[in-house]
């Protein structure tokens, strides 16, 4: 075997793009990845398919004189989006698309694994092909199911996300938080229904919910440090069945975004306080359910990230860009809360489309550029 060429990598990416699958359903993707990996040089490579997370793959490249294990993660799932790119290798699965660029992510990981299977690294390298990033918290599942134990426990962890706003092949990163953490909000306001003409005999949940919504909006402006960033969006409200009956139940659904886990927990506490206050004021029951799952803020480790940025800045072949944090979520944040590491951007040069767009069309030249930059950093990191 030889290291996968740029031409071969592009063909791999195009095939992966044709077979997108949703979270925990990535069977065809998994089988194709496994086929490619098994065709690589196996002398120093151990491949594991965990029974507890069967669409995941762990690939461990044994180092020459290992002092540590460096982890590299890629996600493998797709989104329920109908593709509208018109590409000759468009999705073969109706209503499903790699609209977040995970086909690019996987291809870069395969390129790195291909190189290090042929060129044995100094330290151990762990490659984690992770299912269910877009939903179902695949990273958290992997951790809780014990995938990262023994020789598969990384001392530090890295991962990338493609960014259509950045020039193709560029690398973007920052100290601190790269992605916000997210928490789902579900609130049930329960009162007593009644005739619209006799409000004194009912407990109106619509009025209570309306005031609750307004009070929640004060949390960011009055309970959070204005230098920090946080968002509470309540995107769905359901109440009542007919115009002349006071609603006995109102459902509110929304999301929290915060740049640190500390901030998210602070918002959680204030939400509960506000709900309790509305319940008391309007004589209703207010049940608050918060679900963060594995979507913690992606908080880059200071020491490791400083080293990463320093390398990328001094490498004349890398177009490095200091970036701002994004309020979108990424479940690699959970793993970075367990293992020190860094997440970074790979520019894919499609500024006309956003992530999760049905027209996302990454520039394939970014694949080899990304591999070269990351490969160089990993070699430098191992000393």
UniProtKB/Swiss-Prot annotation:
Superkingdom, taxonomy of origin: Bacteria
First-level EC class: hydrolase
CDD domains named in the record: M20_Acy1_YkuR-like
Reaction equations catalysed: N-acetyl-(2S,6S)-2,6-diaminopimelate + H2O = (2S,6S)-2,6-diaminopimelate + acetate
Catalytic site positions: 75, 134
Keywords from the named record: Amino-acid biosynthesis, Diaminopimelate biosynthesis, Hydrolase, Lysine biosynthesis
Known EC number: 3.5.1.47
Pathway the protein takes part in: Amino-acid biosynthesis; L-lysine biosynthesis via DAP pathway; LL-2,6-diaminopimelate from (S)-tetrahydrodipicolinate (acetylase route): step 3/3
Keyword Electron transport: no
Cited Pfam families: M20_dimer, Peptidase_M20
SUPFAM superfamilies listed in its UniProt record: Bacterial exopeptidase dimerisation domain (SSF55031), Zn-dependent exopeptidases (SSF53187)
Cleaved signal peptide residues: none
A single BP term in Gene Ontology: lysine biosynthetic process via diaminopimelate
Molecular-function annotations in GO: N-acetyldiaminopimelate deacetylase activity
Bilayer-crossing regions: none
Annotated function: Catalyzes the conversion of N-acetyl-diaminopimelate to diaminopimelate and acetate.
Similarity annotation: Belongs to the peptidase M20A family. N-acetyldiaminopimelate deacetylase subfamily.
NCBIfam families per record: amidohydrolases (TIGR01891)
Annotated protein name in UniProt: N-acetyldiaminopimelate deacetylase
